[in-house]
């Protein structure tokens, strides 16, 4: 396992969408610019550990999920299920 900024960005974008925020709204919640969030979501910029912590707390997921993609165990159960469904749907499209 290793840190992949593109995968981290995809997970952040998926969380943002599941929470019902657009990039402008979400960037305000986590105190960064919309353009910075956009760069993070496409993997052009790596989020700081402080930002990852803030996103994890806001989204109800673990840092393990954000960084490594491990399914959240201590976070919001409903959101965790939505993430699993979203992941499986994306995987199915690739088949």
Residue ranges and their predicted role:
Residues 1-18:
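A short, Lys/Arg-rich alpha-helix, primarily the initiator
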Residues 10, 20-21, 47-50:
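Residue-level signal for the short linker/turn that defines the boundary of a DNA-recognition helix
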Residues 68-95:
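Short, charged recognition helix plus adjacent turn
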Residues 31-47, 68-71:
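Recognition helix of helix-turn-helix/homeodomain-like DNA-binding domains
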Residues 20-39, 54:
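Short alpha-helical DNA-recognition segment
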Residues 50-65:
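DNA major-groove recognition helix of helix-turn-helix/homeodomain DNA-binding modules
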């Amino acid at each position: 396992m290793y840190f992949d900024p593109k995968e981290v960005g995809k997970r952040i974008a998926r969380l943002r969408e599941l929470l019902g925020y657009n990039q402008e709204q979400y960037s305000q919640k986590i105190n960064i610019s919309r353009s910075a969030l956009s760069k993070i979501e496409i993997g052009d910029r790596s989020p700081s550990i402080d930002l990852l912590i803030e996103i994890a707390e806001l989204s109800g997921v673990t840092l393990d999920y954000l960084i490594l993609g491990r399914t959240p165990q201590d976070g919001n159960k409903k959101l965790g299920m939505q993430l699993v469904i979203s992941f499986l749907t994306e995987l199915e499209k690739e088949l």
